Amino acid sequence: MAAHAAAAPADTPVPAPVPASEARAGKDTDPAVRVLPTVDVSGSANAGWRARSASVTGRDDASILDTPASVTVVSAARIADQQARTLADVLRNDASINADYTPVGYYGNFTIRGFPLDPASAIRLDGLTLSGEQNVALENKERVEILKGLAAIDSGVLSPGGIVNFVSKRPENVSSVTAGVDSRGSTSAAVDLGRRFGPDKQFGFRINAAKENLHSYVDDANGRRSFASLAADWNITPRASLQVNAEFQQWIQRSVSGYQLLGGTVVPPAASASKLLGVQPWAKPVTTDALNLNARFDYAFNDDWRAYVTGGRSRTMIDDNVAFAYGCAYVPSCGAGGTSPFFFASNGDFDVYDYRSPGEYRRNDEVRAALAGKFSTGALRHDVLFGVGALHRVVRLSTSVYDYVGSENIYGPDLSFDPSPNSASQSYPQLDAWQVSLFASDKISLGEHWQVLAGGRQVLLRQRAWTSQDGEPTRTDRSKFLPQLALVYKPAAPLTFYGSYSKDLSLGDQAPVRASNAYAFLPPLESNAYEVGAKYDWANRLTLTAAAFTISKPFEFAQPDSTDAGYTFVQRGRERHDGIELGASGRLTERLSLNATLAAIRARAYDSGTPAYEGHQVINVPALRATLNADYAVPGLPGFDLLGGLEYSASRTANEEGSARVPGWIVVNAGARYSTKLGGHRVTARLWVDNLFNRYYWRDAGELQGDAYLFIGAPRTARFSVTYDF
């Protein structure tokens, strides 16, 4: 109930895919014809998993090696090899990213460098902000880009952790069908169909569609989804191009409640990964309808100057239903030992609530225009970007049903209760927010070895927020200049050192229902980020990265006090995260490609006025995390690759006081890919096994709206798919 209560293939003898830019332009097309903007993910036939460029920083096709920020790119090929179904699966490739309340059957929430991502602003599609309250489909995505820490120059109001950007596949001549199955009985089918046509191949379209029957490892939590998308391109002239994208997905699945600490201090021992807490026969599934639209027009004035205008709409409609397991206020055992009613009782008793919130409506409308150019002033070379953007965010919610219906025990049998007789009210506006930003940056080259990046954005935020249907809105008006500065030193072409500073503005959180100021929106808060790093391109085959960072922002938490509620949600003190990241991505040998990441983060709260919340790691942020994924082309077996993965997480705190911890864990994944030709058509079979050794572990100890929840990781699951190109 989230807002409920309260690959580029590795080196093999198989020919590598034609880079997207070549596939669209065609080797025999007029070289003067300008094709639509692209990002080279695979780089060359032997580049393995090494991305060369990304657009998530706000500059199209920016070289990752020369960018003074930490960027991760996960290609469509790796997504396919790992049989990823959701963003949560994709983000497991980076150690700096963690699940932060990601229940089965609902959209996921995540942290980057320990800071929660705001789904209203930190999730993007083709550079435009999505309504992130959705599980974005992956069938039509060319790659997923992650920017850590430093915000993109064209961002508006944004959480300090970073940005996740989905990049859509562009039209090219492609025809393929994919069928898949997993060991739990899930089945899926997908089609990918694209063509370029016209006298100069100036027109193009690409259609993706998918249907999936979802069988969860949690009992009674099965579901289904349907997806369709269209991408269209038009190279209007050699200098002008237009692209349009539309996608729709419906996801219907029962949502799974998380466990809570027993007595507020103990991680539930021997808890079942397959038990649907509070399951009731009358509980309906959650239905999420997501529609994402965008368009972009590019115009090149000459080789040095170009402009673009882009805009989009992202809309989600959620019928949120769940028999929600929460707290123990209605059971006698709750008072034993002074247990807070906001946790499960010490013996495992918990309350069940009939929660219904139909017609949750969230919409992001965004438009942006920018001018980019290059010029020289004496010995200085300038690469400039100027732009303006506007984002309108609308949220409408109903007065939900949230009624107690009975109590159960996590170790006991499932019990049936009568649903609440009450009905939800009609929806009302909860949020109406405008963000307008002016941004500019100049990358100045000082000779051959030094670059200075200076820029910033002026952000105007105007927001109205309602806490009840009949109440007066809380108004927020804020104007702030947010600078970005970076210094880059390149002693040699393959080596980059950098240091950067940025200031960001993010929206304040909403107080949880249990606080004395329930539902109140806290004011916007400013964060500061410092980062130094190094990047090395070894032998044009392996990219090595290292970064150290410090990010701080006001600490938001439910502060114990003498009010009737016992807590007030406040901003007080600072929360600072200091960390080191290491990474390696690319081709280690002629046959072995890998992606390895490591993140060590020290996350602390200071000057909060609540000593129990200080002096230890912030909730759900592991001090050390690492990932390793590899692709090995087996000699003597053309087209056959062995795949493997490893994820490690240190233990993490599970409550604000730091008195409870979930243990660390190691999960091993394995798979294989075989690609051959049958009758002149490419056929690719993929096998991937998550959690190969069936490790029992707590994958998520996240906090939502002031309450802490625990989710058990999925047991061993095998997925198999076959793709046929025709």
Where on the chain are the PLM-derived regions?
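Membrane-embedded beta-barrel scaffold of Gram-negative outer-membrane proteins
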Residues: 298-300, 306-312, 316-324, 497-498, ...
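Surface-exposed extracellular loop regions of Gram-negative outer-membrane beta-barrel proteins
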Residues: 252-263, 394-396, 462, 487-531, ...
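Conserved C-terminal beta-signal and adjacent last beta-strands/turns
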Residues: 360, 384, 530, 619-726
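Acidic/polar loop-and-plug regions of large Gram-negative outer-membrane beta-barrel proteins
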Residues: 212-216, 229-235, 239-300, 313-362, ...
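Structural signature of Gram-negative outer-membrane beta-barrels, strongest in the C-terminal barrel
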Residues: 235, 362, 380-393, 429-553, ...
